[in-house]
């Protein structure tokens, strides 16, 4: 799993299987609470376009537009219970994206780590792979189904289990990995590429250390890019040089 580039056939179609990790905060549009249908529809259109081009797309969505377990813990809530609230929030995002993907004519299945049979399938890895092989999008909801695990870690684990080529992390309002927060430091420097070890030792805010370590131990490349810039999902899938690549070598060569 060393390349992030989808293969392209003579007819211009792309192939390859990718895990797309979407920021839950982006679903609210302006960083507030809830779901902005216009934003979700725009994301769905971009995903539908790459699926029609032949890519196999699995998705994990955060729940930051509803709840963040770690933040609720700081405010006095039990961490495990607040994490479960966050997991349920991700399912609402999954259903919203599923609806708009199907409006775009793309078959879509939601699989959840917490069983909720009336709205989604249970998480069954082999079934997820069969869906992908049939051209369906699979959205994984409810995180890992256990507290203390982030949706970034979920995305890394699911990507490995379905044998994805790369983990594509669509961020809200930031176009890659920087040496400091570009929202507060105008002199922040963006990285073109990084090694896994450097991300961990410098505590760069790509994903939590568990997720990055999983990717490092299994040589799963990560591409961090701005989610809401038009065309970026397709660029990431096609292997164009956008955002920041995190991999074994720390370069794009």
From Swiss-Prot:
Asked whether the keyword Nucleotide-binding is assigned, the reply is yes
Q: Looking at the record's lineage, which domain of life comes first? A: Bacteria
Q: Which GO terms describe its molecular function?
A: ATP binding; UMP kinase activity
What CDD domains does the record tag this protein with?
AAK_UMPK-PyrH-Ec
Q: A GO term (biological process) for this protein?
A: 'de novo' CTP biosynthetic process
EC numbers for this chain? 2.7.4.22
Q: What class of enzyme is it?
A: transferase
UniProt catalytic activity: UMP + ATP = UDP + ADP
Question: Where primarily located?
Answer: cytoplasm
Q: Which residues form a coiled coil?
A: none
Pathway as given in its UniProt record: Pyrimidine metabolism; CTP biosynthesis via de novo pathway; UDP from UMP (UMPK route): step 1/1
The entry's ATP-binding residues are 21-24, 64, 68, 172, 178, 181
Q: Which Pfam families match?
A: AA_kinase (PF00696)
Q: A cellular component term (GO) from this record?
A: cytoplasm
Give the record's free-text account of how this protein's activity is regulated: Allosterically activated by GTP. Inhibited by UTP.
Q: What does this protein do?
A: Catalyzes the reversible phosphorylation of UMP to UDP.
Q: What does the annotation say about its assembly with partners?
A: Homohexamer.
Indicate what this protein is called per its UniProt record: Uridylate kinase
Q: Which organism is it from?
A: Streptomyces coelicolor (strain ATCC BAA-471 / A3(2) / M145)
């Amino acid at each position: 799993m060393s390349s992030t580039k989808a293969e392209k056939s003579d007819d211009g179609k792309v192939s390859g299987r990718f895990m797309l990790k979407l920021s839950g905060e982006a679903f609210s549009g302006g960083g507030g609470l809830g779901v902005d249908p216009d934003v979700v529809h725009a994301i769905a259109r971009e995903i539908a376009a790459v699926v029609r081009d032949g890519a196999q797309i699995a998705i994990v969505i955060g729940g930051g537009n509803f709840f963040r377990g770690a933040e609720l813990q700081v405010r006095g809530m039990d961490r495990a219970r607040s994490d479960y609230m966050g997991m349920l929030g991700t399912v609402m995002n999954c259903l919203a994206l599923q609806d708009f993907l199907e409006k775009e004519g793309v078959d879509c299945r939601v699989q959840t780590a917490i069983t909720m049979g009336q709205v989604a399938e249970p998480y069954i890895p082999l079934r997820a792979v069969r869906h992908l092989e049939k051209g369906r999008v699979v959205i994984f909801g409810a995180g890992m189904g256990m507290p203390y695990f982030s949706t970034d870690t979920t995305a890394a684990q699911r990507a490995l289990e379905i044998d994805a080529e790369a983990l594509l992390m669509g961020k809200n309002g930031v176009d890659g990995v920087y040496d400091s927060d570009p929202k507060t430091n105008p002199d922040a420097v963006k990285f073109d590429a990084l090694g896994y070890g450097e991300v961990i030792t410098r505590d760069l805010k790509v994903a939590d250390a568990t997720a990055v370590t999983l990717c490092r131990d299994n040589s799963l490349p990560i591409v961090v890019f701005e989610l809401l810039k038009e065309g970026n999902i397709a660029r990431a899938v096609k292997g164009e040089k956008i955002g920041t690549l995190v991999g074994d070598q720390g370069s794009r060569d």
